[in-house]
């Protein structure tokens, strides 16, 4: 008989499940399929009434295209939501957008110029809405399980009104107050900033040692003695109104050449080296409290200022005498208030000096350092000038330096709710304890929350001032009236109507005015737990999951707002991920020139491979993107797909039915049950990288062992043989497990696989299926197979030696004389399991036997020749062509 006859007699099937994925085409096909059949909506209807699981989406900013960090974040969330949904939970996912703030406002001002606030707001609102639509179209390409018709955004009247209800609650609890305080001020944004809006970057500052002349001395210091002062902000010397000393620190009066100087005793040696003093003399030694009240001449203007006590004075740097400019530093401010020091403000909103700066008026603050230094040099007041590179606060939007500047601002007291915040944090679940400490530090140790901003595009601070310019905070009916207007017309009403038109009738025509500031944008997004209206579900929600920068941002503001409004955290569990970095560990961004467009990646690789890269990343650290790493994930995908294709192809004639299994089939079945349990455990812990690794390792092990030994049964046994059906039963079990296991990570491929699976009660989509439950598996049975694998390794070492010496070509040519006294080993089909021609047992040693048997032309196994084919193939062929095989 010819080769084709034998080949055609084998159980070889074709499959429409292609080896090539063509993911870009299939992504669109299945996205349309899910939308057309309203799969998300069907899932929610099916799960309604079940235990709920809510992952609340932190809103990205509605400006520009999505970047790779956005894609990473949304995919991680989607994997969780898909898994929880398949695990039986009611898990609606409502995407949100953050719409107010400086980037949009600046963009509009650059387009239309300095128009009215109303025009800026109208254009900003239109722009934000257009950006939401653009980003939405891009997010859809990530195959997210959601309904983009059901979203939340911070610029809708309903959201804005709820935000203001929370603000009213803060006011009613006495947490909101107005104060003149130094705050972070951004000249580039011309607005106050909260700590959450500060980014620390490298910056070069002058390191200046100058001197102030004492006007009138006492028993320890004399007129014209020089106080040594150190500063890195010479521009603040204009606003100097005092010098602070440590009351209990030791100070010295020293003479160098013709001058007398005062400085901290502990810093004398260090400063003498810096100033190159060779022959100084210590005249006196005294505690700081001995010179309190001593007056000195201002370094620039003709006025007298005092020496006062300061708890913040340090002996780590400087001279032990600290120049005070009360409106340009927090410590300076409180010391200034306590000692009634003059509060000088010489810097305008744009960072330029006003008339209080005298001859320096009109200069930009940073440029004035050089001019002021030159001025002091002419007066022989410079002891030393150098420059230092150090970490310095910058505006996180413009990346320009910020300053501390005293302005009247609105604050929310954190001090009053610290115990409530600490209690709420104790109830939150963290994957690692250090993350709990991180949130605690950033929330509980923060200063009072600066909530006012001097901008146009945001939610107005709905506060009125009476005829005496005092804020009216004790009239809840006024807040209720405004909130009802905002709920109906949106926050624009605050700018469209006059003050009297915004007030209830009894408060009209009293000469009141309204506040012009807006609320911090972190206040906007930080009320989403309350304002987003997530399928009528109420907090606390199960998970908040954002980038690690949100500990100071959204996690922070959301917690504060929720504790104030509800008395508890808005989230039960907190997860965070790192930033996407390049192969060198640099954060990816367009500004650095190393950014990568996620849409380009999607177009090249398809969504499932992009999602696989996300799942296969240790997201709790920074995530490395490189072509090499992506190709590794392509290989993992290919391995999964090829395995699935093999399973589908070899199940073409299988009708799902339970079979009693052989020892080895039972072993594999139990391994599959163990696989299921490990997958569930790692999905439950949100360890997706472990899910991918477990699946990949199982496939490698399964292919190397089980598929190697059962291909012969699948292809060459009778189609209906029990052995073949037992193998197919395992293949079917694994196919179902893989299909469900990869569905949260690779929804397109999972849906495609599902279309090839035969089963009863099949759903319209794999994503409507239930995730498999944890299964019992026989640990003892699995463990006892370790003995077989030890024997297999030792036998194959001997076989490899034979192959290497070219005595044989393949393992199936040889016999094995096996030394063992194990009943288990003797009971299993070793010829199949070791893929050798023959196994016999020995009491002496294990060795390889060269048999010189014939190779069966049908199955290629080696056999003792009786017929043209081996006994098994003879039996199979006899049913096809009786009496023609002998």
Swiss-Prot record:
PROSITE patterns cross-referenced by the UniProt entry: AA_TRNA_LIGASE_I (PS00178)
Biological process (GO), any one: isoleucyl-tRNA aminoacylation
Note on cofactor: Binds 1 zinc ion per subunit.
Cell compartment(s), UniProt: Cytoplasm
Pfam name, any one: Anticodon_1
GO cellular component terms given for this protein: cytosol
Chief location: cytoplasm
Alphabetically ordered keywords of this record: Aminoacyl-tRNA synthetase, ATP-binding, Cytoplasm, Ligase, Metal-binding, Nucleotide-binding, Protein biosynthesis, Zinc
Sequence motif: 'KMSKS' region, positions: 587-591
Positions of Zn(2+) binding: 856, 859, 870, 873
Primary enzyme class: ligase
Ranges spanned by the short sequence motif 'HIGH' region, renumbered to the chain: 60-70
Listed cofactors: Zn(2+)
Binding site for ATP: 590
Catalyzed chemical reaction(s): tRNA(Ile) + L-isoleucine + ATP = L-isoleucyl-tRNA(Ile) + AMP + diphosphate
MF (Gene Ontology): aminoacyl-tRNA deacylase activity; ATP binding; isoleucine-tRNA ligase activity; tRNA binding; zinc ion binding
Residues annotated as transmembrane: none
Family the UniProt entry places it in: Belongs to the class-I aminoacyl-tRNA synthetase family. IleS type 1 subfamily.
HAMAP family found in the cross-reference section: Ile_tRNA_synth_type1
Record text about domains: IleRS has two distinct active sites: one for aminoacylation and one for editing. The misactivated valine is translocated from the active site to the editing site, which sterically excludes the correctly activated isoleucine. The single editing site contains two valyl binding pockets, one specific for each substrate (Val-AMP or Val-tRNA(Ile)).
Subunit description: Monomer.
Protein name, UniProt field: Isoleucine--tRNA ligase
Taxonomic source organism: Mesomycoplasma hyopneumoniae (strain 7448)
């Amino acid at each position: 008989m010819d080769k084709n006859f034998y080949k055609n007699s084998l159980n070889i099937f074709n499959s429409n499940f292609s080896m090539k994925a063509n993911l870009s085409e299939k992504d669109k096909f299945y996205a349309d399929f899910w939308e057309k059949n309203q799969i998300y909506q069907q899932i929610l209807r099916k799960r309604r009434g079940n235990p709920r699981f809510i992952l609340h989406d932190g809103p990205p900013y509605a400006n520009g295209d999505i970047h790779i960090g956005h894609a990473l974040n949304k995919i991680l969330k989607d994997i969780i939501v898909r898994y929880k949904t398949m695990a039986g939970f009611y898990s609606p996912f409502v995407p949100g957008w953050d719409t107010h703030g400086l980037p949009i406002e600046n963009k509009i001002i650059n387009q239309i110029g300095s128009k009215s606030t109303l025009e800026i707001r109208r254009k900003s609102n239109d722009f934000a809405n257009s950006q939401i639509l653009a980003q939405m179209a891009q997010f859809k390409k990530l195959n997210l399980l959601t309904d983009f018709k059901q979203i939340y955004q911070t610029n809708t009247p309903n959201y804005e009104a709820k935000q203001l209800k929370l603000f009213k609650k803060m006011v009613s609890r006495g947490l909101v107050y107005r104060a003149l305080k130094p705050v972070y001020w951004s000249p580039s944004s011309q607005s106050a900033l909260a700590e959450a809006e500060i980014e620390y970057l490298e910056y070069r500052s002058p390191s200046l040692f100058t001197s102030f002349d004492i006007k009138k001395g006492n028993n320890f210091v004399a007129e014209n003695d020089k106080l040594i002062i150190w500063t890195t902000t010479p521009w603040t010397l204009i606003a100097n109104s005092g010098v602070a000393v440590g009351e209990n620190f030791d100070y010295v009066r020293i003479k160098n050449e013709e001058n007398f100087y005062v400085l901290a005793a502990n810093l004398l040696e260090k400063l003498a080296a810096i100033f190159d003093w060779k022959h100084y003399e210590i005249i006196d030694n005294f505690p700081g409290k001995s010179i309190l009240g001593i007056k000195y001449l201002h370094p620039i203007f003709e006025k007298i200022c005092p020496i006062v006590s300061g708890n913040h004075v340090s002996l780590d740097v400087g001279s032990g005498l600290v120049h005070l400019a009360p409106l340009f530093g927090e410590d300076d401010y409180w010391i200034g208030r306590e000692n009634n020091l003059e509060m000088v403000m010489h810097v305008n909103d744009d960072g330029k000096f006003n008339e209080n700066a005298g001859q320096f008026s009109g200069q930009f603050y940073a440029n004035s350092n050089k001019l002021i230094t030159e001025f002091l040099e002419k007066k022989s007041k410079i002891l030393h000038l150098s420059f230092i590179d150090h970490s310095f606060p910058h505006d996180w939007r413009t990346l320009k330096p910020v300053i501390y500047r005293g302005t009247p601002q609105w604050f929310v007291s954190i001090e009053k709710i610290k115990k409530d915040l600490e209690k709420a944090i104790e109830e939150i679940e963290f994957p690692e304890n250090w993350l709990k400490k991180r949130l605690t530090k950033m929330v509980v140790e923060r200063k009072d929350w600066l909530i006012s901003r001097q901008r146009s595009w945001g939610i107005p601070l709905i506060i009125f001032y009476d005829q005496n310019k005092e804020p009216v905070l004790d009239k809840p009916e006024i807040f209720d009236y405004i909130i009802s207007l905002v709920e109906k017309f949106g926050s624009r009403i605050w700018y469209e109507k006059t003050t009297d038109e915004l007030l209830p009738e009894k408060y009209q025509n009293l000469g009141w005015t309204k506040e012009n500031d807006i609320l911090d944008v972190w206040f906007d997004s930080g009320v989403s737990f309350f304002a987003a209206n997530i399928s009528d579900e109420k907090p606390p929600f199960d998970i908040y999951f954002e980038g690690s920068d949100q500990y100071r941002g959204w996690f922070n503001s959301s917690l504060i707002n929720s504790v104030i409004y509800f008395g508890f955290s808005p989230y039960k569990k907190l997860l965070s991920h790192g930033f996407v970095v390049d192969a060198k560990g640099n954060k990816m961004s367009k500004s650095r020139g190393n950014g990568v467009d996620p849409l380009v990646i999607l177009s090249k690789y398809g969504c499932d491979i992009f999602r696989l890269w996300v799942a296969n990343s240790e997201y709790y650290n920074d995530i490395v993107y490189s072509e090499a790493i992506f190709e590794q994930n392509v290989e993992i995908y290919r391995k999964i797909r090829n395995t699935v294709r093999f399973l589908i192809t070899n199940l073409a004639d299988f009708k799902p039915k339970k079979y009693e299994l052989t020892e080895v089939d039972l072993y594999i079945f139990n391994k599959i049950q163990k696989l299921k349990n490990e997958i569930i455990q790692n999905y439950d812990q949100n360890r997706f990288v472990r899910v991918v690794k477990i699946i990949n390792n199982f496939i490698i092990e399964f292919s190397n062992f089980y598929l190697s030994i059962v291909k012969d049964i699948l292809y060459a046994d009778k189609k209906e043989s029990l052995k073949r059906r037992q193998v197919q039963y395992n293949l079917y079990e694994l196919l179902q497990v893989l299909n469900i296991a990869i569905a949260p990570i690779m929804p397109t491929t999972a849906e495609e696989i599902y279309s090839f699976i035969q089963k009863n009660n099949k759903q319209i989509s794999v994503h409507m299926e239930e995730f498999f439950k944890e299964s019992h598996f026989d640990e003892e049975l699995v463990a006892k197979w370790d003995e077989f694998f030890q024997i297999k390794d030792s036998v194959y070492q001997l076989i490899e030696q034979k192959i290497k010496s070219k005595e044989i070509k393949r393992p199936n040519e040889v016999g094995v004389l096996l030394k063992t006294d194990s009943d288990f080993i003797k009971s299993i089909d070793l010829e199949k399991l070791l893929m050798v021609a023959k196994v016999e047992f020995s009491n002496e040693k294990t060795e390889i036997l060269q048999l010189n048997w014939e190779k069966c032309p049908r199955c290629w196994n080696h056999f003792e020749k009786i017929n043209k084919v081996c006994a098994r193939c003879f039996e199979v062929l006899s049913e096809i062509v009786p009496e023609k095989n002998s």
